């Protein structure tokens, strides 16, 4: 991936981007340290706004993070631990999708290189029905279209799969249920279109 701030600067548009990040899913959920990256002009603007919005940042929480991570190398080591925990979970889901849906042309997905989600695209008009059918079977998922503004997916096709919480064993069962729901809803959709 290109570094977007540098790319915008090189193209003469340094003020187009604000980058936000947080350690919220890395360290303490809901208590992470956040950061903003932007051009000097945009950072100056943000500082003006924040001056009147906050008395001061949670310095004890910042200190807690510095003591825990120490430096960028500590952050990298910690993220490798996260990857070691998440990798088998993602592999379980991705292998299930590939083995059960790979050649059927009723869904596609992105294999993420980081992050906490797998983006699955069903046939248009099927995502809400798939999530509803999964819920009937006891599998609770992120609402269909959650990746779109206001949750309104114009194609009703996107489902965000979040494999980080369940165990790999629970995920194996969840994937079986999910792919079965994808197949059932897709068959209904294809028969409806004939």
Residue ranges and their predicted role:
Residues 1-4:
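Conserved PLP phosphate-binding loop immediately N-terminal to the Schiff-base lysine helix
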Residues 13, 136, 152-194:
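PLP-dependent enzyme catalytic core of the Aspartate aminotransferase-like
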Residues 21-24, 106-107, 145-150:
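Short, solvent-exposed loop/turn elements at beta->coil junctions and helix N-caps
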Residues 43, 47, 53, 117-160, ...:
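Conserved C-terminal alpha-helix-loop-beta "cap" of PLP-dependent enzymes
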Residues 80-94, 106-121:
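Conserved glycine-rich beta-strand-loop-beta hairpin in the small C-terminal domain of fold type I
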